[in-house]
Amino acid sequence: MIKFIQCVRRKSGLSVAEFRQHWDAYREKVQILAEVSQAVRFAMSTTLRVEENIRIMMSRGTDEPYDGLVEIWWKKGPDALEILSRPEARAQLEAIRHLQEEFMDLGKSSFFFGAEEVVLDRT
């Protein structure tokens, strides 16, 4: 299984509430792309604003957590890349890029493909 992962930081000056409004609109666009590209799974996460996250960050000296995380899974990488190169997917990717520029700090975010190895799944 291959997946595309986005670790997203909000733009400076954008409140968490404002980020979440953009995030909801972003979900709709990415969901269309996931469907067009025949993804088998699509998930989005937002960081919980809890004290434990601050303790973890302070004890390990890490940066602040990302504001959001997107994960899209496909069965086969080459098939996903071929589908994503099609005109309908390219058009959706362009619309997504414009939306990203509105609310994401792209220089502090990270986007990458990875191979998933499920070690434990009790769902």
Question: Where are these predicted regions, by residue range?
Answer:
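Macromolecular interaction modules
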Residues: 1-123
